[in-house]
Amino acid sequence: MPTPRLAFALLTGACWLSAAAAPAQTPARPLEPVSFAQVQIEDGFWKPRLDQVSRVTIPVCIAQTEVKTPRIRNFEKAARRQGETHEGIYYDDSDVYKALEAMAYSLKNRPDPALERKADEWIDKIAAAQEPDGYLNTYYTLTGLDKRWTDMEKHEDYCAGHLIEAAVAYYNTTGKRKLLDVAVRFADHIDSTFRRQNRPWVSGHQEIELALMKLYHVTNNDRYAKLADWFLDQRGRGHGKGMIWNNPDMGPKYCQDEVPVKGQREITGHAVRAMYLYTGAADVAAVTGDHGYVQAMKSVWEDVVNRNMYITGGIGSSGRNEGFSVDYDLPNEQAYCETCASVGMVFWSQRMNLLTGEGKYVDVLERSLYNGALDGLSLSGDRFFYGNPLASSGQHARSEWFGTACCPSNISRLVESLGDYVYAKSADALWVNLFVGSTTTIPLKGGKVQLTQQTRYPWEGTVQITVAPERTMPFSLRVRIPGWAQNQPVPGTIYRFADASPEAPTLLVNGKPVAATPRNGYAVVDRTWKKGDVVSLNLPMPVRRVAAADSVQANQNRVALQRGPLVYCVEHADNGGKAMNVIVPDGVGFTPAYRADLLGGVVALQAETPVVTISADGASVTTVPKKITAIPYYAWANRGKGQMQVWLPRKAGEVKVSAE
């Protein structure tokens, strides 16, 4: 299907530096992130969610962490050093740290003295549990320090990574160094134990690599960047030892240890481990300019997106390994799609955008954010999904908490740090990646520039960007034009729109058309800007039918519905208690309408289409026309258990129904 031409053309004066051309030891990425701390979210869709995470979700995480489960109690025991018993799972420390990180972001967005006091209380307990040599892990302190660093699967470095991330976030928000000093001492212990002695170590659950790069940036100590690079280089060299490597159902593929990182070209194993690994590798490449990492990351990312990603941006189809199986194995009702994996896909895709300046990475980031990740958090803010299937016969429900509780604090920290993903910058250009009502002030080499976005996205495709440089000055403004607005739902060919849309995006500056075309997924406006200039972007949002490639057997003769960045589903609560009996023949048109009374306010889709029923005795099948309603996928399972499906049959033979 041909792509509609955009109503603007690219200005030829703009350019970007290719990461592939950057020499080693030269910063590789053309873009730098704009921190969430520089972005004030004033968005009708996201601001209530940030507030709810602060008011509801983080208090839930606190209560579960220190009252309903023994996580904080383990730190208290470790500090007493009286030989008490460890309670819970050996990686539980990480949930404390992720909750602290979410608290740090929340304090920046919504200052709360009581929350800050609680964070300081936890930090005191964490610091008291640290060993004199810098080691910090309550499981081994309480079960025997003689066994530390003996099983690479036991998440010691994973927990350390989340400690470091929390420490950096809390320091950046409050300026308080106590937790950062704890993290530095632990990182120094790890560096002295492994890299400086060249003692082999392969992380069984990657995370420390990306965390060390954050520590490097906040301390400006290249010791931590070298350690991150060293950990990456340990993989694929036969060093792995412990439960993962001894288990024939796992093995080195499970934790991406079969091939050295720079030689990896295909996605394997546990999805969250992979996302954290590749995020860390991209972070290292951004500093060192290591072309080997850049090429590996590009290839593996394309393998994920082209052959192993759900239309929701969810990844990791198999519950057996919480990860990837074989190409195009994307079942719907059995889909695993861990919330943390979608969160990790947001992290990694952002880093790839910064490395390359290509908008396709933000297209996938946006898809994962609005669909696969956001689905993990209930509309009430106090219930969660661990896995995110694309169909349900009624067996799926959100949970208050989990034994392995990585997802609640992970989605919390992502939502609270949303501002990290909205903008980026280069020396003389500003990049608008996400359409979120917000204000930011960004320094360029010619001076500071304030940008203000106003929009009702994702419900409407109109975005107004007001530009206010501190003085009249030339620079380039690059506004992402999403692939879904150009007849490409995702990069590659795994999904395509099954219908045509003649509507094209338009871009105006001060009410006048701009002669520009997209470049690398962006519309480039290169001009001398003055205070009060207004950029108006219109992204048409027709309801689109998505078809999957023939290789995805689960979705043959089915279509999914998408409007803007949102994937839709049909759920029992809107459709007479059923969702599996719907047929969407070719040519059926859906009408969008905003419903303030539905699911906190959503654009719902409606159409009259056939539904199938089977008589009680199973002797007859009836097809009758009925008005059906589809809702955004992220909003399902907020009204009790029941049927749901994303991929809707085009023919009666594909319908799954039960006798009435």
Language model feature labels by segment:
Residues 17-27:
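Bacterial Sec-dependent signal peptides at the C-terminal "C-region" and cleavage site
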Residues 228, 297, 363-371, 376-466, ...:
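C-terminal beta-rich recognition modules with glycine/proline-rich loops and embedded aromatic residues
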Residues 189, 199, 204-206, 210-245:
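Solenoidal tandem-repeat scaffolds enriched in leucines and small polar residues
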Residues 7-18:
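Bacterial N-terminal signal peptides
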Residues 115-135, 226-233, 292-309:
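Carboxylate/His-rich catalytic cores and anion/metal-binding grooves
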Residues 249-254, 308-327:
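Flexible glycine/proline-rich, aromatic-decorated loop/lid segments
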Residues 25-113, 117, 147-173, 206-223, ...:
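Aromatic (Trp/Tyr) and acidic
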Residues 141-157, 164-167, 177-203, 209:
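Asp-box/WD-like beta-propeller blade repeats and closely related beta-sheet repeat scaffolds
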